Amino acid sequence: PESVVNVPILAMSSIEAQANLGYSMNFKEFTLCQTMYITANVCVVSPVIYINVLDPKKHKKDLEAQTVKVDEYQATVGMEGILKKGLVVTAGETELKENEDYTLAFDTDGYLVVTLITSGKGASASELTVSGKMLDTSAVDKYDIIGAYDVNSGKETGMEVIRQIFPKLGMVPGILLAPGWSHEPEVGIALCAKAANINGVFRAVAFLDLDTEKAKKYTDVKEVKEKSGFTSELCYVLWPCFMVGELIFSASAVAAARLAYLDAENEDIPSKSPSNKQTPITGTCLADGTEIVLDQDQGTVVNSFGVATAINRNGFRPWGSYTGAWPASGDAKDVWLNVRRMFIWQGNTFIQTYFDKVDDNMNRALIDNIIDSENIRCAAYAPQHWAGASIEYLASDNPATSILAGEMKFRQHIAPYTPAQTINNVLNYDIDTLTSALTEG
């Protein structure tokens, strides 16, 4: 429906998302449905906020006349994306009227079902002819996903709608993704830019896919990643696609759901890496279905490029904790996904926790209140989620000019754990124990 185009749609379940936006198993054309399926059948998580850019006013084409058989007053048009608005239904030469002669609905496959009303003109018809308009997913392009701001209407589209999430829904986005589109450099880079600045104060991470038409083997990954421009500390880059049986998904859709599930198990604190956590997928492949079989050694090579993948070790699992900033950066707070997310989470949490203090009198009581409250709050997360954290108010950070301007600055120190990416075990031959055992007695 037009009412759910370019607006943030909050869904507390996959069923709720499907009810608002519709659903199709054609994940290549209806890309949001990937997340609907995964969050219902692979990693059950909620809430999810969807932004649909498929606009029936703009992305449509003619529906050529379809003749369908009537069975027990019902006729099903076996095509997805048919628009109810402007639909013409005829029985022979007689044009029928909706809600007088028939009703319309969609079945679970997304096909249009025409149900004849027994008192209507077409009640005795054995077949119907249907024509009108239908959605044209091929008309959607990367610039629809990126979106824009219309200076005349004041309307936002695409990624620009991310701005509306907090003021409308009161939620701060944590992971941004565009499955089926983020492999496009323009889309991926724009998504990272949005993650860096949400409502002027918040930050998030972006999960991006590499183009499997360009990166067909694991040794192609480095060049494709760099040419795509996916080098931000705010992005988590994945290659190739993930499979569940015969279904093919963008890796970003699966990994984002798996990480959200991990967060939920971890008190909603993003202190853990998704790497090496078993995930119910059955394989990896290119977008065209070509199977990719990586062992640990090859997966680690992919990781060395700052790209995550999946390997099979008694079950498939994501493999890789680096953000896109690796290997160009060696800064621990930027190259480890869980460390970067902890910095983002702490920054966002501080803003939300102390927002009510804004415009209070800037006095010592306010300073002490924030310092004491924050130190107590942060201490509760040690040692499980980080090694520790502290906050201070320094005179050097708060000169008279800042105080007179109504500005105050705190300096916080946090110590999230880095992942144990490599665990080495050095074996030594204990000759003393050997000789002792042989000479005893």
Task: Please identify what each model-predicted range represents.
Residues 6, 84-88, 125-127:
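Exposed beta-strand and adjacent loop surfaces of beta-rich binding modules
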Residues 1-9, 15, 439-441:
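N-terminal alpha-helical "arm" segments
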Residues 120-136:
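Small/polar beta-strand repeat architecture
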Residues 103-125:
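A surface-exposed beta-strand-loop module
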Residues 48, 58-63, 131-139, 143-151, ...:
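Compositionally biased, low-complexity/repeat regions
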Residues 1, 9-12, 22, 31-59, ...:
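A glycine- and small-residue-enriched flexible loop/hinge signal that marks low-structured segments
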Residues 43-107, 134-137:
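Extended beta-strand solenoid/passenger and fiber regions
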Residues 336-396:
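Acidic, low-complexity glycine/serine/threonine-rich segments
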